[in-house]
Amino acid sequence: MEAVEDFKQDEVANIPNSLLISAAYIGKTKKVSLKFYNPESEKIYIWEDKTGHQPYCFSKMAPEDLEFLSERDDVIEIKTVKKIDTLKDKEIPVSKIIVTDPLAIGGTQTTQSIRNVVESWESDIKYYENYLYDNSLIIGKYYKIENDKIIPHDFEMSDETNLAMKSMLFDKLGNTGMTDTKQFEEEVSNWAELLNQPVPKIRRMSLDIEVETDGMRLPDVKIADKKVTAIGFEASDGMKRVFVLRRDGIEEGVNDLDKNIEVVFYEKDQEKKLIEDAFGLVKKYPVLITYNGDGFDLPYLYNRAKRLGISEDVNPLYMMKDSATLTKGVHLDLYRTFSNKAFQIYVFSQKYSDFSLNSVSKGVLGEQKMDYGVEIDNMTYYQIAKYCQNDAYLTFKLTSFNEDLLMNLLVVITRIARMPIDDISRMGVSQWIRSLLYYEHRKNNFLIPRRNEIEGKSAGMANDAVIKDKKYRGGLVIEPVEGVHFDVTVMDFASLYPSIIKVNNLSYETVRCPHEECKKNAIPGTSHWGCTKKNGLTSLIIGSLRDLRVNYYKSLSKKENITDEERQLYTVVSQALKVILNASYGVMGAEIFPLYFLPAAEATTALGRYIIMDTIEKCKGIQLEVLYGDTDSLFVKKPTVKQIDDVIKLAKDDHGVELEIDKEYRYVVL
């Protein structure tokens, strides 16, 4: 979400205990604005920064060498500060360039932006993200504001939860595999306290519009010269409504709508009132849900309203470069959420193959769009009403099915990623993990390295990639023993790559670290070494989240003596962690990731191959036949209970990874 030029907002100095849900930069006031959702009033409160925080970036040039920048009107101050260089593992002096406007740092292709003039650090971070990181503000966490001071609020965990955490989690942390166990335990504890905070029911409304068409040509959202013929609504308070515009040549048709759906007709010259009434409804709900609302519904409504002369004071919408938002609320475009591969694969198990509302609804809900067999311009009034309201219904239900699963997931992921919920709903998992790591860098006073600095660590280093167009070798696949096999057990390495990252301290700054004494800590199957002096940031974060999911949330969600609300929370948190963890290795191994480091990616897959091969050898040693193996699982034939227990213990003792029974088959054909 980029700068918002003229948010019209109800800004307040005192806010009751509320969930921080979003943030934006207000271009007009040159300040960050925070949005808090209050579960009791079901409203969003808006608070604008009063701390005097300013945009900035860093340079490794001395302040006197940057003196020429001081002549600029938008440069406030250049001063020396100390930051920790993670690649050299030492504190260094850097120049902090403080400016009046984020555009003075970046955002243009001209010399107006300092990053185009001097080599700079941390100059590609959105200003409102910088603000959140610097103030240790976590989206999805509860805060109250008293006299313009933000005060964190943590709900106390129950005695039962604390006891469960101790028995399931902390008692198992004795052998963490981490360089600094105390730091790791603190990280786990902090995550558990944050993720166990309640997730509120969020009041929201979905919206879908229909527009006149000109033959097969789609309406142009910028010109917006075609009439809005219908707007459908569905809300969390049970409201079901549809506005329909009367036009010449349209038949009334038969009213077969559900009796709970209210139909409101507008005369053909009342399109302006129809849109104004729709805006009135939008203002009553803190969160607006659409399906492709960024690409069509909201920009069309916004531009159509301008064309019809509707006052900007009445219009609650605000258009940005590639998305749409609300001046006093939050807009979630589910098209972009369900297009996210992490959701498609890890949450919804690829139940849909394309991202249309119809395909997603059929796959996830088992429901679909109305089909009258005619184009919408040939439908009757009541067919248009039903068609449009049904789209709003499907859009809303995608957030409400399975006890508000998607909404709850989005809130939990905002907590993990430290990112506004509207950004979470639109951006891929690589952006989530980038935000989380940047937050942790800032918390620890680490200077976020430039891409070329990280690449410089491995300059001139050969690797043994064997697959065309791959920079490093991937996971291992063992050729199957062909034939029909009876009594086959599939054993799965629980979160294998996150486990490897944790146990072997893999992070961009700890693989091939600068310490001579660490070079003897060789990583099997590579020419690399791992740090033995400090926890890597990636290892610490991914490892703590992995342990929480495997040792705590997965087990806790299955306990019998917990409330339905607790079970729902633990299940959702476990799923959110699954999404992050399953995607984490792929993200770290993607060249486009800003903290990508080839040796770390290479070490992760090399260790995966090594663990699989070593486990197969251990199986042979206890006369357990392995029929097949892939990236993180083994098919074993007719195992005894003792053999299963032995191989699980060997994997844990030798490699710090957890092997578990996934499936059991009477027979398999390989």
Regions found by a protein language model. Give the residues of each.
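Gly-rich Lys/Arg/Thr-decorated short loops/hinges at beta-loop-alpha junctions or inter-strand turns
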Residues: 248-262, 587-606
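Generic non-transmembrane alpha-helical segments
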Residues: 364, 611-622, 646-654
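Active-site-proximal segment of RNA-dependent polymerases
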Residues: 470-472, 601-609, 617
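Short beta-strand
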Residues: 87, 625-629, 661
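The two-metal-ion catalytic cores of nucleic-acid processing enzymes
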Residues: 1-341, 347-457, 461, 470-489, ...
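C-terminal polymerase-core module
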Residues: 637-670
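Core alpha/beta catalytic barrel or barrel-like domain that forms the active/cofactor pocket
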Residues: 372, 585-592, 624-631
